[in-house]
Structures are given as structure tokens and as C-alpha cells.
């Protein structure tokens, strides 16, 4: 499948509608086939490097799976009978609870994410074909744009995180497609309205685009669609708020409260303005932030050329509002995932605006724009090419560390344990897991945000839950660990996506030293290559 094969589907827009759809389907099938081959190779290599098992590139995916299991049992959190909100998404744990109900395990979120990636590709192809971007374009340009599309939405690497981000990208792009339909005087489809409603439910940062899209629909005279979407969003958020209140949990999940700078500033009563300023500075110096700002500037510049096109200006304004929201409040990276949705939005919006601008340009000028167009899109997509190349190594890295920690807790030392990196240790573990970082433990989260968390609180919580062992990153605890804990081993692993290469194993006063030693000695010989357990105390 060559670039020429992708571009060969071009034809005059004056052709009949059914012919257009046939050509679109052919092009979409070609680009989907390319994506499928790339993703299949990625998956096979990742499984091979992870000891023949499906292991996601981030341990966070298993937090959602643990929450999904508790949802099926009538709870919410990672431990039976204890409520917490470690999930960064409102709806994602419920979606994968359905796949957990049929015992799909990790394949459940992977299938949802892969389907979302494929649907996003189709949505973008339909949108770009419909707006005429490919008209009179050479096959090399069409092919290059199509291949770049695969990576600018991170359709190869992102599903392997096992998280909600691929679904978020789909909802973002589909919402934009609904705005593009409104710009042509058509009401958004039911699917496009559903995508808009899902935005804040999939990821909280989706609220920025959701609000901007609602305003844009009103300005584009699609008030009925805007009212319906707004009512559904309000109902869903109210239901979620009522659920959290009933469980005694905060409205925002622990992951947001502990990670977002501006939220942390609000809870700690420090200057929120300073937190936003810090985020703006980060956006200027962060490679992902720089790419986002460049795409935002491209959208703004193209919109200026289209200043007589009211619908285009309205949509550009909505996109820039979402971009600005992420620049001011959003996060970047964390293995190439936090910013993908807004990078994809800005890129697709820019291509759509360029398509509206082209008929107003001299043919030579339009041709001259092709090179900078591809250069900027390629520059924006490159980190996700790198992510695709790194994904098998990242999957192996999680297998080498968190997967082995989970094995130790479930198979070798079947007692309550404490960790600071929740996920595989908690997933399908019948014993209590204390999260010393606070995502899955409300007392820890509250103590950290109150500024009263240290060795004494760690010791008290461990004693309260009869925790016998702790597996932690020492550097995450600058105040140290309780003096009563004894370091008994260190797990040495390579460093790719894990937060630290060495995991310290501590024995608490409640543990039986002989039992701990037996478990460690039985565990050590079972570790995969390039992973070692140094037993310090016997």
C-alpha cells in the first residue's frame, strides 16, 4: 500500500454523492489497513517482549480495571468496603466494568481503545474528503496527509496505554465534525451530539471543548442541538456529583486533585493565578506545548485570512478556546497521552480551515502551502511516532516491574501490602492494598493536601490496615519512611516508563520476618531477565 494508492481515490467534487462515498470508503479502507498492520505489529512485539502477556505501557490502566471490578461488586475504589476515586475519568471505569463482567481482562480496554482509534481515522477521512481538502491535490500530498493522520492522533501507541485517551480523541474529533456540519447549515448527527456529551465524562479537560462547542452551536443557529447536549451533560454531571456525594468522595477524582497544579493550588489556598502562570510557562518550554502553540497559531492565522467566513471564525474560536484551556490548565506527556486530544483537534481544525481557504487562493499560492502544511503536521506528529517505537519497550518495562510486584503480592506474600504506584498490585488482589501516594486512599489524599503527611501518618495507616510489607520508590518520600520499618529487599529493573528503576521492599512491625524471607527467596528465582531482587535482611 503506497502513498499513490491512497491518493488515487481523488476525483472531482462535482461527482454524484454515492460515487464520493465509494471513493471515501476506498481511501478509508486503505488507511485503516495501514493502521491495522502497524498496530498489529506493535501489539505482537509488545506481547512477545512482555513474556507472552498483554501488558499495557502504563500501570495506570490497571487502576481503572481495579475500580471496574469494585463497581461490579457494588463498590467504588480499589479495596472492598472502602470508597476512593483514583480514576481520572467519570465514565471509563463503567465502560470497562462491562468488559470485566465478561472476563476480558486487559483485552477489554484494549479493544475499546483500538475501536476508538479506528473510528477516529474514519471520521477524519470523511471530514477531510467532505470539505474538499483532497480536491486537485497530488497523490503524494493526499497520501502523506493520510499517513500523518495515523500518528497525529497516536492511533498506534495510545491504545496500548489501556486508558481512556483514545476514546477522548475520538469524541474530540467527532465533536469537531459536528461543528463542521453545523457550519454547512446541517444539524449535528446523533453520534456527534453523543460525542459532545461524552467529552467531560471521558476526561475532565474535555469540558473546555464541550463548553466552546455548545457556544459555537448556538452561534451557528443549531440551538436545539446545543440545548439537548447541554441538558444531557448537566444531567450526567449531576448524577456523578450525587454519586460521589453519597459515597463521601470529592467531586474531582484523586488523580486530578493530586496532579493538577491549579486544583492543588485551590485546595492548598495558594495563588491560583500563580499556578496558571506556571502552566503557561510550562507550555512555552515543553516540546508538546510548543507544538500545540504552533498549531494554535496556524489555526488563528488561517482564520484571519477567512475573516469574512463567519462559520469558520466561530469554529476557529471554539478550537482556540479549547487550545487555550489546555495551555493554561492542562498537562503534557506522561508517556505521550495527556495532550493528544487537543493536538489532534488543532491539526484537524487547521486542515478544515485550509480547505475552506484554498478556493480563495491563487493555484501557485495554494501549491506553495503544501510543504509548510506537511512540515508542521509532521513536526506535531513526530512525538507519537517515537511513542509507537517505544511502546513495546514500555510494555516490557511494566512487565518487569509492576507486573512482578503484583505477582509477589498475589502469589508469594498473600497479605495486605502498601505501595505508592497503584495498579497491577491492586488489580484482582483479594488482599488489602494501601496506596501511600493517595490515589486509592482517601486518608492519604486528605493528609497530603492538608500538608500533614509523613512517616508518622504512614506508620499509623499501615498499622490500621494490618499492612505487613510496603513496596515503594524511596525517592518519592523525601521525609523518609517510618523508623519501625525495615528495608528487606530492593527490586532492580530497567527504566523506561516506570517512575523509578528501583523498588524498595519494607517489612513492618506486624510482619513475620521468617515468612517475609521465605516469600522473597521463593520470588527471586522467578523474575524475568534483566530484573534482580537483592535480599538485604533475612
Task: Tell me the role of every PLM-derived stretch.
Residues 6-538:
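Membrane-proximal envelope and lipid/glycan-remodeling enzymes
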Amino acid at each position: 500500500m503506497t502513498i499513490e494508492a491512497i491518493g488515487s481515490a481523488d476525483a472531482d467534487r462535482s461527482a454524484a454523492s454515492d460515487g464520493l462515498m465509494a471513493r471515501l470508503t476506498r481511501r478509508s479502507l486503505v488507511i485503516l489497513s495501514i493502521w491495522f498492520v502497524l498496530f498489529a505489529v506493535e501489539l505482537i512485539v509488545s506481547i512477545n517482549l512482555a513474556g507472552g502477556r498483554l501488558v499495557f505501557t502504563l500501570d495506570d490502566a490497571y487502576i481503572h480495571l481495579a475500580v471496574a471490578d469494585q463497581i461490579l461488586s457494588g463498590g467504588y475504589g480499589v479495596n472492598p468496603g472502602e470508597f476512593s476515586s483514583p480514576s481520572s475519568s467519570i465514565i471509563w471505569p463503567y465502560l470497562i466494568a462491562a468488559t470485566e463482567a465478561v472476563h476480558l481482562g486487559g483485552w477489554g480496554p484494549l479493544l475499546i481503545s483500538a475501536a476508538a482509534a479506528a473510528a477516529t481515522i474514519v471520521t477524519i477521512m470523511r471530514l477531510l474528503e467532505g470539505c474538499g481538502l483532497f480536491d486537485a491535490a497530488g497523490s503524494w500530498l493526499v497520501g502523506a496527509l493520510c499517513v500523518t493522520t495515523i500518528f497525529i492522533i497516536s492511533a498506534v501507541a495510545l491504545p496500548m496505554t489501556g486508558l481512556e485517551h483514545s476514546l477522548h480523541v475520538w469524541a474530540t474529533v467527532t465533536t469537531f465534525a459536528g461543528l463542521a456540519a453545523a457550519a454547512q447549515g446541517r444539524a449535528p448527527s446523533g453520534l456527534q451530539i453523543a460525542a459532545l456529551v461524552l467529552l467531560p465524562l471521558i476526561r475532565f479537560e474535555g469540558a473546555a471543548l464541550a463548553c466552546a462547542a455548545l457556544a459555537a452551536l448556538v452561534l451557528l443557529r443549531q440551538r436545539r442541538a446545543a440545548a439537548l447536549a447541554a441538558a444531557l451533560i448537566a444531567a450526567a454531571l449531576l448524577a456523578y456529583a450525587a454519586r460521589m456525594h453519597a459515597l463521601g468522595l470529592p467531586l474531582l477524582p484523586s488523580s486530578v486533585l493530586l496532579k493538577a497544579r491549579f486544583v492543588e493550588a485551590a485546595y492548598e489556598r495558594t495563588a491560583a493565578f500563580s499556578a496558571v502562570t506556571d502552566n503557561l510557562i510550562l507550555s512555552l518550554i515543553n516540546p508538546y506545548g510548543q507544538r500545540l502553540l504552533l498549531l494554535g497559531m496556524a489555526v488563528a492565522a488561517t482564520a484571519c485570512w477567512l475573516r469574512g467566513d463567519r462559520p469558520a471564525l466561530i469554529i476557529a474560536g471554539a478550537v482556540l478556546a479549547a487550545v487555550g484551556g489546555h495551555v493554561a490548565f492542562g498537562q503534557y506527556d506522561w508517556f505521550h497521552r495527556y495532550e493528544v486530544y487537543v493536538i489532534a483537534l488543532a491539526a484537524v481544525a487547521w486542515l478544515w480551515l485550509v480547505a475552506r481557504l484554498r478556493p480563495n487562493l491563487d493555484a501557485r499560492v495554494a501549491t506553495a502551502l503544501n510543504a509548510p502544511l506537511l512540515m508542521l503536521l509532521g513536526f506535531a506528529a513526530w512525538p507519537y511516532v517515537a511513542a509507537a517505537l517505544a511502546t513495546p519497550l514500555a510494555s516490557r518495562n511494566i512487565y518487569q516491574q509492576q507486573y512482578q510486584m503484583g505477582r509477589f503480592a498475589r502469589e508469594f506474600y498473600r497479605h495486605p501490602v502498601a505501595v505508592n504506584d497503584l495498579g497491577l498490585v491492586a488489580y484482582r488482589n483479594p488482599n488489602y492494598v494501601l496506596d501511600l501516594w493517595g490515589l486509592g486512599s482517601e486518608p492519604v489524599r486528605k493528609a497530603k493536601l492538608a500538608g500533614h503527611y509523613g512517616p508518622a501518618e504512614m506508620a499509623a495507616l499501615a498499622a490500621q490496615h494490618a499492612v505487613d510489607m510496603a513496596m515503594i520508590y524511596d525517592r518519592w518520600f523525601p521525609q523518609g519512611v517510618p523508623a519501625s520499618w525495615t528495608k528487606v529487599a530492593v527490586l532492580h529493573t530497567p527504566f523506561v516508563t516506570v517512575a523509578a528503576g528501583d523498588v524498595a521492599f519494607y517489612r513492618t512491625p506486624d510482619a513475620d520476618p521468617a515468612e517475609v524471607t521465605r516469600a522473597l527467596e521463593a520470588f527471586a528465582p522467578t523474575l524475568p531477565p534483566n530484573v534482580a531482587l537483592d535480599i538485604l535482611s533475612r
